[in-house]
Amino acid sequence: FATKFILEYAEQFPKLRFNMLSPSDVPSFLEGKADVICLSAQAQLSNCIMLPRGRMIFVPVATPQYLKEHGPINHPDDLLHHRVFSNLYPNSFSLNSNYQLTKKGQSCSFQAIDTIRYSNVEMTRRSVLEHAGIAPCMPLFFIIDDLEAGRLVPVLGGWHRPSHQNYVVCKDDDWKIRQIRMFSNWWAQKLGDYEKECEARLIKLYGRKFFLNLIH
């Protein structure tokens, strides 16, 4: 979806050049090496404009084939018996990931010592689609097509990583530059609209009750 959106903007402003990096590198952004950055659940950054771009909703998933071969996964304790593919990265070289999971007012912490951990969410998705394990916290917007096609299904019986706000961020000084301000506003609106579309599609698939549980 990001490619489609960027191409749309590039067609309107053909002289602009885009260099897209993933995952986001906050230190490099603060050093002035990037004009705009997408962040999730970050504390307020000083001297920055933070534009809301929708909610980050996480869905724990596996493939139907994996569940058929390994049995149901209904509780965080079940994760101990499965390969967990993580795209959390407390630092670049740590294999330890601490999952904060919640369900209907309850919460628990799961400490995963990942044998395979990715800093790129697409690699996590591919590993799960290859029936190699489960992903406890996949972003909804990244897997909504897979959910609709039945390639992935929710697991953990309603337990999930808490949702949080997403932002498009630029520095105060850059906000004064019309080109950067225009793109930042447009990008935040596009991403926010897409998040809402994904939420509506999820409700159509699993119902409003399922959705409401994920956003708390």
Protein language model features and the residues they cover:
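Short Pro/Gly-enriched coil loops immediately N-terminal to beta-strands
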Residues: 32, 43, 51-62, 78, ...
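Secondary-structure junction motif
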Residues: 83-106
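Hydrophobic hinge/microswitch elements
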Residues: 107-154, 159-161, 176
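A local structural motif
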Residues: 13-21, 106-115
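Beta->alpha turn/N-cap motifs
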Residues: 24, 40-42, 62-64, 137-141
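C-terminal effector-binding regulatory domain of bacterial HTH transcription factors
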Residues: 15, 144-145, 149, 159-216
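Flexible hinge/capping segments at coil-to-helix
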Residues: 48-55, 62-87
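Central regulatory/effector-binding core of bacterial HTH transcription factors
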Residues: 1-46
